[in-house]
Curated annotation (Swiss-Prot):
Belongs to the TRAFAC class YlqF/YawG GTPase family. RsgA subfamily. Binds 1 zinc ion per subunit. It is found in: Cytoplasm. GTP binds at N139, K140, V141, D142, G190, Q191, S192, G193, V194, G195, K196, S197, S198. The gene is rsgA. PANTHER family: SMALL RIBOSOMAL SUBUNIT BIOGENESIS GTPASE RSGA, SMALL RIBOSOMAL SUBUNIT BIOGENESIS GTPASE RSGA 1, MITOCHONDRIAL-RELATED. One of several proteins that assist in the late maturation steps of the functional core of the 30S ribosomal subunit. Helps release RbfA from mature subunits. May play a role in the assembly of ribosomal proteins into the subunit. Circularly permuted GTPase that catalyzes slow GTP hydrolysis, GTPase activity is stimulated by the 30S ribosomal subunit. GO terms for cellular component: cytoplasm. Residues 89-248 form the CP-type G domain. Its EC number is 3.6.1.-. This is Small ribosomal subunit biogenesis GTPase RsgA.
Length: 313
């Protein structure tokens, strides 16, 4: 879509609320922007009109560059091509959560709610598909004996993933996490109640993000983040706080692609007898042989089977 860039400003979308988007202009001014009608008509089942993280061109509608409100008004005219998108399935369609990121912070909790490796594995697959770095954070480690987590940490670490145990309550590894986020565009993903908002408040005191409790009846957290939002960090970079995801379904990944996205299964895929082998019940399967020989961790293979059988078949 062609626009007259000479009369437009550039900025980045911080959050989207219904028909209005908060855009931080490159000039440092915060704008409340509507979306040009022609952009809405371009929306398809594969693309949201505007999402947090989008780079946009917009027209300022404030008088002489001075707003009559706390935020200047604007009209978004064009969205730049997206990179590093994270999506999930919503009612059978792609729902883009955030765009233009280079890392995904996958936050789980050791307790309240308990850790769910299958959810971590699904998020890691999504990060690989988006070609962004997955980083695993296990929060609330003050509630358990860290020795109990060592086998799980060992599995992910052996695959080359960074794994960081943290506690927003005690401050454990918060300084390391702050350094890890510096000058990066990072999405936070995890189910409700794992402590995403608490960690952000610890990383950057003064944010004042709302913190929800975990239900003692079902061990599930309450949603405190209701829409994806970009939060600039004082030390450089930004994080995208996304709504808690209880069922993080894979988007646009076929059953035949999953093994190739798992670094521990990938080396054995080409050794199978059948090119379309799914490594479940087929004969002469190199992946199953590697599991039997303990060259592939049995828990990881079980997670692979669960992903295929529960979500992709």
């Amino acid at each position: 879509m062609s626009v007259d860039e000479d009369n437009l400003l550039q900025g980045r979308v911080l959050s989207v609320h219904g028909l209005q988007s908060k855009v931080l202009g490159d000039n440092g001014v915060l704008y409340a922007c509507a979306v040009r009608q022609v952009l809405k008509s371009l929306s398809t089942s594969q693309r949201n009109v505007i999402v947090a993280g989008d780079r946009v061109w917009f027209r300022s509608e404030s008088r002489d560059g001075v707003s009559l409100k706390s935020e200047a008004d604007g009209m978004i005219e064009r969205v730049e091509p997206r990179t590093g998108m994270i999506s999930r399935t919503s009612r059978g369609r792609q729902h883009v959560l955030v765009s233009n990121i280079d890392a995904m912070l996958i936050i789980a909790s050791a307790e309240q709610p308990g850790i769910k490796p299958a959810l971590i594995d699904r998020m890691i697959l999504t990060a690989h598909q988006c070609q962004i770095e997955p980083i695993v954070i296990i929060n609330k480690v003050d509630l358990i004996d860290l020795v109990d987590l060592q086998p799980l940490i060992g599995v992910y670490s052996s695959l080359g993933y960074r794994v960081l145990p943290t506690s927003a309550e005690t401050g454990q590894n918060v300084a390391y996490l702050r350094a890890l986020l510096k000058d990066r565009q990072t999405a936070l993903a995890g189910q409700s109640g794992v402590g995403k908002s608490s960690l952000l408040n610890a990383v950057q005191p003064g944010l004042g993000l709302a913190i929800g409790a975990v239900s003692s009846d079902n061990d599930k957290g309450k949603h405190t983040t209701t829409a994806s939002q970009l939060i600039p960090l004082a030390d450089g970079g930004a994080v995208f706080d996304t709504p808690g995801i209880r069922q993080f379904q894979l988007w646009d990944i076929s059953a035949g692609e999953v093994a190739g996205l798992m670094p521990d299964l990938r080396p054995y895929v080409s050794g199978c007898r059948y090119p379309d082998c799914l490594h479940l019940a087929e004969d002469d399967c190199a992946v199953k042989t590697a599991v039997a020989d303990a060259r592939i961790d049995a828990r990881r293979y079980d997670a692979y089977c669960h992903l295929l059988e529960e979500e992709l078949m």
